[in-house]
Design a protein with these regions (language model features):
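A conserved acidic beta->alpha catalytic loop
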Residues: 74-83, 103, 127
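Glycine-rich, basic loop-to-helix element that forms the pyrophosphate-binding segment
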Residues: 101-118, 140
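Conserved donor NDP-sugar-binding/catalytic core segment of glycosyltransferases
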Residues: 135-165
C-alpha cells in the first residue's frame, strides 16, 4: 500500500467562497420555496436512479413542525438519476432543490456545494441510496439538539448495519475515532460548524473525517432508536471496491485524522485500524484459502506501521489470523455433524 501525503495544516481550509466556486447549477422554483426552513436535508446521489424515489419520499413524509428544504446533489451520474431527481422536484417544488454540474465533482465537493447553499441552522444528511424509516426522525432529533447546546450533532441507530459501540446518550471524540459507530443517514448537524472545512482527502470514508472534525467542536447526542436504513448493494462505492482498495481508503482516512489532530489520538486510531483488519480478515465461503493467504501477507506487511503503535493488539491480530484455518475447519465439521444428526432424526421419524 502506497503512503499517503495528506498533511495538516499544509492542506488548508475550504472556505465558504471556495465552496461556492465548486461547479454547480441549481434547478429549483425560487418563488415556491419556503423562506426560513428549520432543517436543510442534504442528499448526495450518483447512479442511484432505482433508489432515489424511496429516499426522497422518506424525507417528504417527515412529521415536522418547521418547513424543510431538500437539496439533492446529483454528481453527474451515468444513469438517469438526474432525470429522476427532476421528476421528483416537480412533485414538491416548494421543498426540493437540485444541484448538479456538467462534470463529476467528487464526494467532498458535492457535500460542500450543498452545505454552502443550505439555508437552515440545522443540516440532516441522507445519501440517495439510503432512506429514513421513522417519520419523527427530524422532530425528535431537532428537539434533542436544541435542548443541548453542547451537541455539535446528534445521531441515531441505523438498520442493516452493526452497532459497533454500546448505546450511550452521548459519544465524544475518542469513541468515534475508535469505531465507525453512527451512520451518515442518521446525522443532524449544526450548520454553524461548517462555514469552513478542512481540505480532507476526497475519499469514500469522508463521513469518518466529518465526524472527527465535528467532534472537535462538541459532542454527539444519540437516540437509541432505528431511524434510517443503510442499503448494501454492489453499486455502492464502498461495497463495489475490492478489499485492497477498501483498506487503502481506510488507511488514508486514519492518516488524515491522525495528522489533523497532531497525533494526539494515535492510540485510538491504531485501535480503529486493527479493528478494520479484523473485519477484513473474516473468511468468505468462496475463495476461502486465497483470502486467508492474502490476509496473512497484508497483515505482515503492516508490521512496521501497526506493531509500534499497538504491539499487543497487533500480535493478537496475527495470532487470530494464524488459527483461522483450524477454526474454520471445526466450524465446517460442526455443521456437517449437525446436518447428519438432523438427517438421522428425520429418517427415524419417517420409518414405521
Amino acid at each position: 500500500m502506497r503512503p499517503h501525503s495528506w498533511v495538516w495544516p499544509d492542506a488548508g481550509w475550504v472556505t465558504h467562497s471556495q465552496m461556492l466556486a465548486i461547479p454547480a447549477h441549481e434547478f429549483s422554483d425560487p418563488g415556491a420555496l419556503c423562506v426560513n426552513p428549520g432543517v436543510s436535508v442534504l442528499m448526495m446521489t450518483r447512479n442511484h436512479v432505482q433508489y432515489l424515489e424511496q429516499a426522497v419520499l422518506s424525507v417528504l413524509e417527515q412529521s415536522f413542525g418547521d418547513p424543510i428544504e431538500l437539496l439533492i446533489g446529483e454528481d453527474h451520474s451515468d444513469d438517469a438519476t438526474l432525470q429522476e431527481a427532476l421528476r421528483l422536484q416537480q412533485k414538491a417544488p416548494g421543498i426540493i432543490r437540485i444541484i448538479t454540474a456538467d462534470r463529476n465533482v467528487g464526494i467532498r465537493s458535492n457535500f460542500l456545494r450543498l452545505v454552502c447553499r443550505s439555508r437552515a441552522p440545522l443540516i440532516a444528511l441522507l445519501e440517495g441510496d439510503d432512506y429514513w424509516t421513522d417519520p419523527l426522525k427530524l422532530q425528535l432529533q431537532c428537539d434533542l439538539i436544541r435542548s443541548h447546546p453542547e451537541y455539535a450533532l446528534v445521531a441515531a441507530k441505523t438498520a442493516n448495519r452493526h452497532q459497533w459501540l454500546p448505546d450511550l446518550p452521548v459519544y465524544d471524540l475518542p469513541h468515534l475515532l475508535r469505531r465507525y459507530a453512527v451512520h451518515t443517514s442518521s446525522l443532524l448537524i449544526r450548520r454553524e460548524h461548517l462555514h469552513s472545512y478542512p481540505c480532507f482527502p476526497d475519499n469514500v470514508c469522508w463521513e469518518s473525517m466529518l465526524l472527527g472534525y465535528l467532534l472537535a467542536r462538541g459532542t454527539c447526542g444519540f437516540l437509541p432508536v432505528e431511524m434510517s436504513y443503510y442499503r448494501r448493494h454492489h453499486g455502492g462505492l464502498w461495497h463495489n471496491a475490492d478489499r485492497l482498495k477498501r483498506l487503502h481508503m481506510s488507511r488514508e482516512c486514519i492518516d488524515a485524522l491522525d495528522s489533523y489532530f497532531f497525533r494526539r489520538f494515535s492510540k485510538e486510531l491504531a485501535d480503529r485500524e486493527i479493528w478494520i483488519h479484523q473485519m477484513d480478515a473474516t473468511l468468505p465461503t468462496q475463495g476461502t484459502w486465497r483470502h486467508w493467504r492474502q490476509t496473512c501477507r497484508l497483515q505482515l506487511a503492516q508490521a512496521s506501521r501497526l506493531f509500534p503503535r499497538a504491539p499487543l493488539a497487533y500480535l493478537l491480530l496475527l495470532s487470530h489470523t494464524s488459527v483461522q484455518p483450524l477454526l474454520f475447519g471445526l466450524q465446517r465439521l460442526r455443521c456437517r455433524l449437525a446436518l447428519g444428526s438432523r438427517w438421522r432424526r428425520l429418517r427415524a421419524t419417517a420409518l414405521p
